[in-house]
């Protein structure tokens, strides 16, 4: 049962929809998820009682992990899942979304200068995540699989530390984008392309937080076990 002592990241691992509860409450379940619900509530828009009530209701209504709980996967299977669910879709989405963001910044940026800043932040996010996922796929994930199979990988702790640093940096970019767009609130004057950009950036934000959560709090924990 979820209690005030339960760790935020563990709740999201067992009940992925809890991520929406935490986001609405202003709680970082991703890079800042290694704290108890009681500690999180002190930084929240909700009281401890209200937060626990929502989470316990979700617990009663949900099957843990929606039928797949990643914490029970092997390191190799979890990595394969992360690549299929997050790395490949993100690569394709960044390719498709970039022209739309470029168009919105060009057409509407002169009247709404924050859109030019948004494009710059998006470009930073895109460059960081493209390099980050390539580094994982080509170098870090094979090292992790080797380590989980009993091979000596002396640099495993440094690999994890470096990846967590990358995650923190990406998290800061996402927060800036969210603040800049007022949580992706679509202005009345927004054209269809502008609306599309906000909707898809919001989806990227949500997917990235889940992606980072799986690595920080499930994959890396398996390598420490």
From Swiss-Prot:
Transmembrane listed as a keyword: no
GO cellular component terms, A-Z: cytoplasm
HAMAP family on file: RIC_ScdA
Pfam families: Hemerythrin, ScdA_N
One of the GO biological process terms: response to nitrosative stress
Entry superkingdom: Bacteria
Subunit-structure text: Homodimer.
Primary residence: cytoplasm
GO molecular function per UniProt: metal ion binding
Protein localization: Cytoplasm
Protein name: Iron-sulfur cluster repair protein ScdA
